[in-house]
Amino acid sequence: MKFAKLCLQPVLVLMSLSLTSCDKNDQMGVLGEEKDKAKIIFVNATPNAATQPAAAQREIAIYPFYNNVQFNTFPIKFPWSNGYKAFSPGTMTMRFDTAQSQANNPPGGAAKVGELTFQTEADNYYSVYSVGTVQKTEFVQLNDDLSLPTPGKAKVRIMNYSPDAPPLDLFITEGTATEPVALATNLAYKGVKDFFEIDPGIYTIEFRLAGTSTVVKNKTRVIIDKNSCYSIWARGFRQVPSPGNTFGGYAFDISYHANRWSNPL
């Protein structure tokens, strides 16, 4: 199987939500460096649900294999990604193995946790998320419509990948605006609102319990650039399995990343 790393850099903004930009001369709004290839990004959205104190602290990462080829030097930790990779189009079978990081004691061996087969087409983009928990992992494959939005606009997609959260609404507020605007409502676990257009800006975003004003989590200064495509998703546990022991990064939070980014300068 032939594969190549894709030059398009998905700008991951998963933990701190501070945007890492490309060089200002690199106009990432133009796709096509890997013509006639299918492009796939893997995102680890799978927290550790262990209830035993020692096990609850462990960060258990995942190795993705593509048609039996594994070319990541390190496993992908929650809630990170390995970026888009380019492959010959056709049938893609992805296998996923857990791999415990060096922080774990004992480190343990890798173990298969799942497999996913889907068809790919040339010049199309796909996202694969591991969801659920490390103890019961599921996989979601999404087709990524990375066509450019209307000039001056941006596109966003919204997902609920928090395994224990009830249905959620997503609201945004720009600048000093006093009234939040609902972008998605009643998103159940694994629910997706596919790409749609919004105005670019610097937003406060918040997930609320569906149909209420109860805010589960909010993030400020979320940068949405024009002519770009973003995914926004709920992650982690609303109620951590082992209070006081569960690794802090597994608590409910908001992630977003740019599937396609255009330099606004």
Annotate each PLM feature.
Residues 17-21:
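C-terminal motif of bacterial Sec signal peptides marking the signal peptidase cleavage site
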Residues 10-11, 265:
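Generic low-complexity segments that are intrinsically disordered, proline-rich and/or Lys/Arg-biased
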Residues 22-265:
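Intrinsically disordered, low-complexity polar regions and short flexible loop motifs
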Residues 1-10:
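Bacterial N-terminal signal peptides that target proteins for export
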